[in-house]
């Protein structure tokens, strides 16, 4: 039986130091009290106009279902950010639309991973897509810290991340401008974990 999203988050964080707690909220109101900066990066607001220190947060898109993950970390934690994403298999059916999306968004390495793995192609594609999105989201906290003390813009997209293995320890690779940006942010690796939730692919990404 697949892990629940909560179990997957706990399992992904169990190998890291300085994690004080975590949780996932489900439903339309998930993340309703979360703040967003001018770049739409989420954060936990304090009682004033600032940010509550020691919290990392990530929210899935509203469609098909909204989940909000919150992690509390100590100052010496090796976890720099988290990202979560849900991807529906319906978007990756092997029709003209699904093939076009796959050709546009996936690298040759990712296509090879899909073609050689066991499982349905729509689910495997959904996993790869959710990994790229979650990896991108996992950089949000580090980016907020960067822009708090730097004027230099760091521009990259979810498609710039590449799933290099189904193994969590290898996780998501960072190509070209993304590799440069992550190096500046102090991110040396991004770990990826998967489960299935309500016929969708759910991914947790941990930036370290």
Where are the predicted features?
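Core catalytic alpha/beta fold that binds nucleotide/phospho-ligands
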Residues: 1-208
């Amino acid at each position: 039986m697949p892990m629940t999203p909560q179990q997957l988050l706990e399992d992904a964080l169990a190998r890291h130091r300085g994690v004080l707690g975590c949780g996932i909220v489900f439903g339309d109101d998930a993340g309703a009290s979360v703040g967003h900066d001018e770049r739409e990066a989420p954060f936990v607001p304090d009682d004033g106009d600032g940010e509550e220190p020691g919290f990392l947060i990530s929210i899935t898109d509203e469609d098909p279902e909204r989940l909000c993950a919150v992690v509390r970390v100590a100052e010496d934690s090796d976890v720099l950010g988290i990202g979560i994403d849900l991807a529906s298999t319906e978007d990756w059916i092997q029709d003209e639309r699904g093939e076009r999306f796959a050709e546009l968004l996936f690298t040759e390495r990712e296509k090879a991973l899909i073609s050689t793995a066991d499982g349905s192609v729509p689910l495997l594609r959904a996993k790869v897509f959710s990994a790229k999105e979650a990896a991108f989201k996992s950089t949000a906290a580090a980016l907020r810290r960067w822009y708090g003390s730097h004027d230099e813009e760091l521009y990259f997209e979810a498609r710039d991340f590449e799933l290099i293995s189904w193994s969590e320890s290898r996780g998501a690779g960072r190509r070209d401008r993304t590799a440069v940006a992550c190096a500046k942010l102090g991110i040396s690796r991004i770990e990826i974990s998967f489960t299935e939730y309500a016929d969708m692919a759910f991914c947790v990404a941990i930036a370290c």
